[in-house]
Amino acid sequence: MRKIFLATAAVALLLSACKQQPAPLSPAETLIQRLDTLQHGPIMYGHQDDPFYGVSWQWEKDRSDTYELVGDYPAVMGFDLGGLEEHHSKNLDSVPFSWIREEAIRHAERGGIITFSWHPRNPRTGGNAWDVTDSTVVRNILENGEQYELFQGWLADV
């Protein structure tokens, strides 16, 4: 009986010493955790369209002014999705969306943070995102507005 008790106690002790693996974090939880850690640290540097063009060059794969200057990529890279709503193959800065996707994935794999902005065309006038010639644009993309359905379609595409 004593041997059974000692064997049971030994197994219980061994099992209690084993750490349970934590559940894997979702990408959102990982980002929140990283941002929480970084908020008390050094300043993070970001660069819009970093791998697509720089001082005296453009559209050269595997280039980055930041990397060439300091030996590391920016902590944050931003990319614009303007043009996606109209199914263009390139964004409003003429960057192919396929490149944006590729570079966003590469930067995430390096541990970087990616931001996306979206500057759609003006749905009221057809002008660019900075066209403010019509003061009714916002009213017209809201529910019951003339461009509501169009804008909802754009949102679904983006």
For the regions a protein language model found, what residue spans apply to each?
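N-terminal module-boundary/linker segments of secreted carbohydrate-active enzymes
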Residues: 20-95, 105
